[in-house]
């Protein structure tokens, strides 16, 4: 019933859906023997909007696919340097999603996917590049750690757990998950101990590489529903990994030496050219990475063959680290400035301090990752004391704060003079 009489005899109208009276809502719209209030209309609009957006996302990645040049420009906003790696990634990702758009069309030429291997020192931006690409394309993304993976049947994570995490990240929408991006970090840590096949079982090294082969190439992976454990008599969610892009990354410490041994052949005799092994830095040597070097490092040939696109990232120099501190949209200096602004103070870091931070990060050999810990250490006391201080207008960090551990300089607001005070 949408109509009732009140105690005073007045006829009251009620919403047929939520039961609220005309006095409890702003608007009551009448239909044939039914009424609906403005609150229920808003709720219905929200439900329709949510369902429409989920249907749009099921169709896969963005329809307006950015060109490689546009992708590279978007990466420039978040990642400093590494121009060669950005170009390689942009072209590979563009071709991959262009291929997905043409999957339904009948053609004699079948386009195969090209997975990517990122080679570069720690803190050079491998993970950030993959994250930024996934965010730009609005596709499901997951980071997996290769060091936690083991062969099926052993204690540790199965390779199917990677797909399970990807599925969780898109609320178990299978169609979306099948067009996502998977970044497998620390791939170099599962290399076998030598380039010869092992006669003993290596469940966390070569065994994991073998397990990853079909997953990366394309297979139907069985994933437990809603993240449960695998057990018999259970229904599994079937995920086709053929159209999932896999990006593998690793530091490959020691690869430069293998490349040098291959490329810098020394002669014998008086007329032989003696080449200095210190002529090129490790980053420059790594640019000449060949599949045979990766196999000698410890990756199995089958896995190297499934990662045809190799992008090498250089070690970040002092200038690049200073740019990372200042220029990206989410630069560290901007982040800490925001934190201090919340306490009513401004952050100033002098040029000499920026250079000292960059030099310290290079000395630690942690790349861009070391910048945050250096800044955190320098600002720790200030962030501890500032909430109790009422009059600080600016926090200044100079070279001494970074190199000698001196306290940052605090500048206070001028106290207003009270007129008539004696």
UniProtKB/Swiss-Prot annotation:
GO cellular component, one term: HslUV protease complex
InterPro entries reported for this sequence: AAA+_ATPase, ATP-dep_Clp_protease_ClpX, ATPase_AAA_core, Clp_ATPase_C, Clp_protease_ATP-bd_su_ClpX, ClpX_bact, P-loop_NTPase, Znf_CppX_C4
Stored SMART domains: AAA, ClpB_D2-small, zf-C4_ClpX
PROSITE patterns the record matches: CLPX_ZB (PS51902)
Transmembrane regions: none
Residues reported in the UniProt entry to bind ATP: 121-128
HAMAP family documented for this protein: ClpX
Protein name: ATP-dependent Clp protease ATP-binding subunit ClpX
Source species of the chain: Herminiimonas arsenicoxydans
Gene that produces this protein: clpX
């Amino acid at each position: 019933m949408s109509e009732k009489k009140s105690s005073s005899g007045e006829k009251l109208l009620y919403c047929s859906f939520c039961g609220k009276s005309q006095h409890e809502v702003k608007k009551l719209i009448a239909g044939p023997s039914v009424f609906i209030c403005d609150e229920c209309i808003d709720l219905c609009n929200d439900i329709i909007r949510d369902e429409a957006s989920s249907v749009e996302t099921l169709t896969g990645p963005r329809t307006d696919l950015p060109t490689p040049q546009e992708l590279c420009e978007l990466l420039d906003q978040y990642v400093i340097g590494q121009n060669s790696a950005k170009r390689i990634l942009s072209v590979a990702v563009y071709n991959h999603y262009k291929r997905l758009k043409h999957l339904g069309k009948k053609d004699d030429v079948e386009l195969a996917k090209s997975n990517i291997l990122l080679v570069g020192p720690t803190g050079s931006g491998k993970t950030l590049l993959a994250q930024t690409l996934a965010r730009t394309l609005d596709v499901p993304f997951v980071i997996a750690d290769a060091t936690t993976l083991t062969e099926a049947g052993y204690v540790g994570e199965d390779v199917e757990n990677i797909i399970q995490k990807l599925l969780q990240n898109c609320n178990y929408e299978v169609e979306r998950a099948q067009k996502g991006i998977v970044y497998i970090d620390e791939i170099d840590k599962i290399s076998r101990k030598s380039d010869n096949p092992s006669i003993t079982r290596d469940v966390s090294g070569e065994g994991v590489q073998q397990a990853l082969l079909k997953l990366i190439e394309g297979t139907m992976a069985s994933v437990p529903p809603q993240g449960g454990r695998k057990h018999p008599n259970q229904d599994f969610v079937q995920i086709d990994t053929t159209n999932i892009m896999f990006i593998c990354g690793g530091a490959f410490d020691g690869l430069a030496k293998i490349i040098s041994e291959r490329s810098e052949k020394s002669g014998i005799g008086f007329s032989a050219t003696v080449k200095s092994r210190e002529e090129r830095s490790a980053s420059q040597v790594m640019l000449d990475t060949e599949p045979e070097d990766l196999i000698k490092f410890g990756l199995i040939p089958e896995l190297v063959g499934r990662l045809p696109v190799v992008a090498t990232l250089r070690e970040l120099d002092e200038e690049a680290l200073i740019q990372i501190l200042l220029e990206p949209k989410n630069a560290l200096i901007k982040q800490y400035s925001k934190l201090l602004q919340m306490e009513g103070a401004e952050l100033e870091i002098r040029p000499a301090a920026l250079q000292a931070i960059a030099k310290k990060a290079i000395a630690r050999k942690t790349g861009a990752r070391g910048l945050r810990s250096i800044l955190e250490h320098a600002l720790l006391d200030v962030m501890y004391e500032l909430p109790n201080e009422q009059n600080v207008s600016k926090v200044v960090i100079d070279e001494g704060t970074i190199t000698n551990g001196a306290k940052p300089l605090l500048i206070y607001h001028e106290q207003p003079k009270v007129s008539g005070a004696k």
